[in-house]
């Protein structure tokens, strides 16, 4: 799918983060440095991090960072501190171990452990994944010609993951003749992948491997040329290489290097298989180059040169390119142009700009375009018949839902495969007939013991300080009484223009069945209500994200869904920034908060260009080397604004190998909170020492993490079972 934002599928969490420039450093002589580390004196005495003041100055503003030293993962004292925090977390949560086991067993029982995906037909093969009872990972398989044919195992993640604490397969690509498989593997969580190529006929790997790629690759149509992308020192994808199997010199050609640090480089292929596409993308602009996939030794040529603040996304059909662009269209418009004359002078508009409809992405097939829109905050599917020019909107059965297209690799199809879910409907795979407008359910994820009629969803709106209506999606068990006694989890994100749509979670049933309400706040900074919604929650408008979330919490309390002493909030990554900010602003409003890999040290990170993602995210948060952005970021950055006050109970998580949010951000924040907060409420830092941004990879290990978070909530709320 051609999509402007990396998909949040299906969880509301980001695929990017934030960072920025070098700052002036003022070293102060004669500072008394406290070189001590208080480890637990008793079973439940929290560790106290030592203070080594690091003094920085910019614009005449002097800042003291006592916990900068935690950034050095090579220092054994840093690792010892993280381990001490983990030991404290385990000790504090020890009374909940039986409850954690109960929750884990509940959640695991709901899973159909032996299962398979809906097969995807590519040429003469059916490709699918399956899981097996008791196994943590997926198995990639195919059958030739017929689903009754012999099964061929392509990748067994369980075997490849043996002996590893972390394992993830990134992208994988079947070669045009279906005899080779290229796939990428990450074994640390640092998101640096190794490319492997497997001979499927011999069931063996080639000796040729390529380390430290970004996880994506594409085949040319000759079946022996593969294109891949390498990182720079800041883990920014910036170089495109061409690798030819069995080439005599074994030296890969570097085809392009992107020197503008705001731009990431990617490689793709049109569904028509005609063109390879090199895309260059910042937060506010894009540029595409194309190459005839039949002639991989040729050079890429630019389609449309980059223009500041102009984005476009491209697909191909016959003699035309299709562009989704914000050129003179804040909410994007769809245009077409001849392949030989793609310039703006030759554009023909198919969908004009609209103030009320936001175009998020599109797919191109031989006879149809499928366009993914948002209208009044809800996703919508528009189908355009390329033979007639007519269009229609598809209908969905529930008032609040989420859907996104599957890969749909067949260019000639008239069946669009879509994934659908809601807060009460498990993941469902449909084939939608683009001609007859009918849909066929191919599979609905089985959830053992689940009865959807027992649960109810509702869409409600809070009102922000400036009068803006903020949508929320709620789910709870039928018969709920609005008596202010219900425990409630309020989830939020609000960044990068990504849309946090309602999603089904079988794990969440362990909350709903205990009387919880779950609420998803679609605050500004996301893209749920269009491009303006995003712009009103970024850069100098970022604080709208936080005040919107506070308005949502106040609304839920005012409407008697819950009370402040029953309200738990959660968010991850950039959503963790949201959590960190609101507990500084309104700690009285929440009983507990869960901040997963939270981006909380915004100012220091955005002032340091040696940290991955910093420069590219100036366009999201602002460049603090400019005074107005410095002042604004400093005014809300959670780490800078920790106060001497009472805080709600907090569970904070981190990943030692996280390349998006450095583990030291949650660690520093926790250390500062311990030193300054005036309460005895729980404060737990749990660092995964063998994973990165997304945490553990095994499906059952993940359940243990969820059980721990739920048990933390239950302990704080006084729920015993």
Predicted regions and their residues:
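Glycine-biased, low-complexity coil/linker segments
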Residues: 22-27
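Mature N-terminal segment immediately following signal peptide/propeptide cleavage
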Residues: 44-95, 103-104
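Asp-box/WD-like beta-propeller blade repeats and closely related beta-sheet repeat scaffolds
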Residues: 151-171, 182-230, 234, 239-241, ...
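Blade-edge beta-strand/turn elements of extracellular beta-propeller
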Residues: 157, 199-211, 247-259, 294-304, ...
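Polar, glycine-rich mid-to-C-terminal structural blocks
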Residues: 238, 243-281
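Active-site-proximal cap/loop segments of hydrolase catalytic domains
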Residues: 520-721
């Amino acid at each position: 799918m051609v999509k402007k934002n990396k998909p949040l599928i299906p969880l509301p969490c980001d695929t990017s983060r934030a960072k920025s420039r070098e700052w002036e450093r003022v070293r102060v002589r004669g500072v008394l440095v406290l070189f001590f580390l208080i480890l637990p004196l008793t079973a439940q005495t929290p560790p106290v991090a030592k203070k080594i003041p690091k003094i920085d100055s910019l614009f005449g503003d002097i800042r003291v960072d006592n916990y900068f030293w935690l950034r050095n993962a090579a220092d054994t004292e840093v690792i010892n501190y993280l381990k001490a925090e983990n030991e404290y977390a385990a000790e504090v949560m020890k009374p909940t171990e039986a409850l954690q086991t109960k929750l884990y067993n509940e959640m695991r029982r709901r899973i159909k452990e032996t299962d398979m995906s809906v097969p995807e037909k590519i040429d003469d093969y059916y490709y699918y994944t399956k899981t097996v009872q008791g196994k943590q990972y997926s198995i990639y398989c195919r059958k030739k010609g017929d689903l009754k044919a012999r099964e061929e195992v392509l990748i067994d993640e369980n075997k490849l993951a043996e002996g590893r604490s972390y394992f993830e397969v990134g992208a994988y690509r079947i070669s045009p003749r279906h005899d080779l498989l290229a796939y990428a593997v990450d074994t640390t969580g640092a998101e640096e992948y190794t490319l492997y190529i497997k001979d499927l006929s011999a069931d063996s790997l080639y000796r040729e491997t390529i380390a430290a790629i970004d996880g994506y690759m594409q085949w040319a149509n000759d079946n022996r040329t593969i294109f891949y992308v390498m990182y720079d020192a800041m883990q920014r994808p910036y170089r495109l290489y061409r690798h030819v199997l069995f080439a005599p010199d074994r030296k890969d050609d570097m085809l392009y290097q992107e020197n503008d640090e705001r731009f990431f480089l990617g490689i793709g292929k049109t569904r028509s298989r005609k063109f390879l596409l090199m895309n260059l993308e910042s937060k506010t602009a894009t540029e595409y180059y194309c190459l005839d996939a039949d002639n991989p030794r040729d050079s890429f040529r630019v389609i449309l040169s980059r223009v500041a603040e102009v984005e476009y996304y491209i697909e191909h059909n016959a003699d035309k390119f299709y562009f989704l662009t914000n050129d003179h269209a804040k909410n994007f418009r769809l245009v077409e142009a001849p392949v030989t004359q793609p310039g703006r002078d030759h554009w023909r508009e198919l969908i004009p700009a609209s103030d009320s409809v936001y175009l998020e992405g599109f797919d191109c097939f031989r006879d149809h375009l499928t366009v993914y829109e948002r209208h009044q905050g809800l996703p919508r599917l528009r189908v355009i018949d390329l033979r007639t020019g007519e269009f229609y909107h598809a209908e969905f059965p529930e008032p609040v839902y989420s859907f996104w297209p599957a890969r749909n690799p067949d260019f000639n199809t008239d069946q669009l495969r879509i994934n659908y879910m809601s807060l009460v409907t498990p993941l469902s795979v449909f084939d939608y007939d683009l001609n007859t407008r009918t849909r066929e359910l191919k599979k609905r994820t089985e959830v053992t013991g689940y009865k959807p009629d027992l649960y109810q969803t509702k869409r409600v709106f809070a009102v922000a300080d400036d009068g803006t209506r903020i949508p929320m999606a709620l789910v709870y068990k039928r018969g709920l009484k609005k008596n202010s006694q219900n425990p409630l989890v309020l989830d939020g994100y609000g960044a990068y223009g990504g849309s946090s749509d309602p999603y089904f979670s079988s794990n969440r049933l362990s909350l709903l069945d205990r009387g919880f309400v779950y609420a998803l706040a679609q605050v500004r900074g996301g893209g749920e209500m269009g491009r303006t919604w995003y712009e009103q929650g970024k850069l100098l408008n970022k604080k709208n994200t936080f005040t919107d979330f506070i308005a949502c919490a106040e609304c839920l309390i005012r409407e008697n869904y819950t009370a402040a002493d029953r309200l738990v909030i959660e968010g991850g990554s950039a959503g963790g920034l949201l959590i960190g900010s609101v507990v500084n602003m309104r700690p009285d409003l929440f009983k507990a908060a869960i901040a997963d890999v939270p981006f909380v040290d915004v100012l220091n990170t955005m002032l340091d260009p040696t940290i991955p993602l910093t420069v590219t995210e100036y366009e999201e948060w602002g460049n603090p080397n400019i005074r107005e952005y410095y002042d604004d970021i400093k005014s809300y950055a959670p780490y800078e604004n920790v106060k001497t006050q009472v805080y709600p109970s907090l569970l904070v998580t981190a990943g030692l190998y996280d390349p998006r949010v450095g583990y030291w951000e949650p660690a520093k924040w926790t250390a500062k909170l311990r030193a300054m907060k005036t309460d005895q409420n729980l404060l737990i830092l749990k660092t995964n020492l063998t994973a990165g941004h997304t945490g553990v990879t095994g499906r059952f290990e993940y359940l243990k993490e969820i059980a721990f978070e739920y048990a933390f909530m239950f302990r704080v709320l006084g729920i015993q079972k």
